């Protein structure tokens, strides 16, 4: 696997390169401008010096008369020293030097070949090589009082001297560039570390992986997820949330919309203000019942938004009913197993005691009892799932010290829709459990259940000999979480009512103090067509 540089290293290198490029551009730009400025200044100095010497009366007089050569030599040396030029040469119309920094060169022809223009009366500047090396020269003609040209002045500054001046002028820039590079490297490291900290120390590929995992989780979850910023604007809605929006009749794109415009019953803004979560809140929107959980999003102690998770309440209820049904199956099987083990222990004891006559009588009693209990249920209840559940429930109730009588007034056919059986198990199981709780402290612990099927209607009646319920309890008994038996109770009858509503049935509660309670249920029930080949 190819090893890649870490983000901090890459950022440091990148920022350093950017800083270096910027500094190099600055250096070359400033350097070029400085070089041009110095060269222009040197040209101006040479030209001004040449003009000053050419206009001096002594120069024209010496060239015209051929006298005062020493005075002219002394004058040009003073000018050369004052102006800092390399040489000041006065020549006649034949190009013969009259002055020169090196006296041995006086009287000889001017070297360079660029003096011809000035001898024709033209002022010009050029670069050429002479006895003192390559230099930048300014040429100015000398005129007598009568206006006749009598010679010329050449003032030069060597290229080496100009380069030295340029180099000296650029030295501070070299220092500034080096310091800037050093500061840039430190700044790059600081920027890279800051960015790394902002990204919680994660590398780009790690962030990409987290985003992919987050997206996969959001889109695969069965709950709608909605995230808003601190202003209540929707910033995220997963696929399930959008599906539920469609079921609510909301077909607009929720992103960047105000949450109150999309979900008027949302409490996300309140959650942001109070910084307190709201959990398991029942909400009905456009006929769709939802279970909402809303929590604030906090970052470094600041609330930066909120998240809502919501699900179709009917789906949640269906899951709860399935879990309730499984639990009932397990309890029934456990009770039946426990009862049979007790009977086997009795049989084993009678065998060991060799009480074979008593053993025979005991087995006959068990057979008669089992036949009387099971024959009606097995013969009349055609759904094996429901029949097995009822038999197991009888054993469980008996194990708890109570008695459950089940009467079938005619045949109860199997349901055409298997989900109806699961709903019935939820209804019957919860009502029998409620009856068991009611008779727990009563001297007579009797629960009676009857079923009757007629004209696609299933009637169920469950009666207990408990203490009964007051009118106040009867009014609240089907509310979620309401119970007279303490905390973490009050869900059985609530789910029972929901299951009956799902089946489009109805339930009547009749209860009197010290007389017991009766639940009467009527449910539409389509029988399954049986094949009789």
Swiss-Prot record:
What's one GO BP annotation on this UniProt entry? Answer: regulation of DNA-templated transcription
Its main localization is membrane
Membrane-topology descriptor: Multi-pass membrane protein
Q: Where are the transmembrane segments?
A: 10-32, 173-195
The keyword Nuclease belongs to this UniProt entry's keyword annotation: no
**One GO cellular component, as annotated:** plasma membrane
What is the protein's given name? Sensor histidine kinase MalK
Q: Which organism is this entry from?
A: Bacillus subtilis (strain 168)
